[in-house]
């Protein structure tokens, strides 16, 4: 009975979807038969003959139902094949349409990293092979576009890719190889209208980094087609610049609101903690950029604030608290001066033209009148004068030095050796026992090294007996080596004597 009810529901659904009149008549007849069969089954009071007839009718109904199902399946297969043919034809039409659009300008969407979507002028450069289903459930294709007014680095087209010489693929290249957008999202191209340029008009201006930055118009010269713009933000050293008309793109009210919403969503999206973390990231990025900039900056010989060596250095401490990084230039962007401003003193009674001539005569030296350079020259002159005075005083002889060198010279020579030995003995007595032990080990190593050198020289003498000149040089070298060895052995004996004396004294003081 449940099976008959399910079959009745299937027939009713088929009636709702059927469009052919003949098919509807057959389904209505089948529905009436099923309803009659259900009523007979629920009754349960008929005789066996009626029951047999009903069962026969039920079999007939089952056969008709199976035939109907097969017909429905055939109809669905035919419809599916027709729909596939329609989809193929629709896709071919789409590709033909989009292929004809290659090379045209349009307005394409761009999704930023923070989720905001904005439209920018772009150039269609190709059609993607992949087929997609758009938001309406229809077939669509994707177009590859290059933005003509990129405002962010991920939108900037790769110049090598445009020339066909980029060595990186789309995932590894830092620049854009074209953004993929759906064909249904393409809008009409917005050409720039330079007649709208006026004071305080919002514009996009192209800087040397090939990015387009927002700004406000200060004044316009339509004759020379030049416009002065004040750039937004604090990342530009020269906020007010002159741009030609081809380097500008006037913004409408809707475009300005869209760009403003982008910036506000990128900065104000999230909670206050996220804002603080974003500010920290911006500060860290700023400091990293300044440090990177300092690596490519000319390093002077004198660092900024070197004079604080003689002071407490309060100036550098205050600058560090205000965010200054040592080694970078002055200013918030680190692009200011690195070398300190040197004081200059011009000659007295000379005009500026005469001073310029003097500087040009010195090959345009900027530090020609520098105070620091004059002080350095004066210090060098004083140093040379002191050296000459010392040499002159050392060569100067008087009566007393003459008497000491000539009359008393022999006595001094006789007393020189014992006085030197006495001084050396007194010198050894002033050192500690540990120092004497270290010196003894060092002298012993030197003696062994000197003995090895003497043995090598002796081998050379034995090997070169026929060469007279070489024999003389080797013998002189042998003589010098033996003298040095004798000196080292004498030092070793002196150290041993001093150590033995100290040991004897220690034994005498023991009770």
From Swiss-Prot:
Biased composition (Polar residues): 478-493
Keyword Chloroplast tagged: no
Subcellular locations according to the entry: Nucleus
Residue span of region Disordered: 254-281, 409-433, 478-511
PANTHER family: ZINC FINGER CCCH-TYPE WITH G PATCH DOMAIN-CONTAINING PROTEIN
Function per UniProt: Transcription repressor.
Protein name: Zinc finger CCCH-type with G patch domain-containing protein
Annotated source species: Drosophila ananassae (Fruit fly)
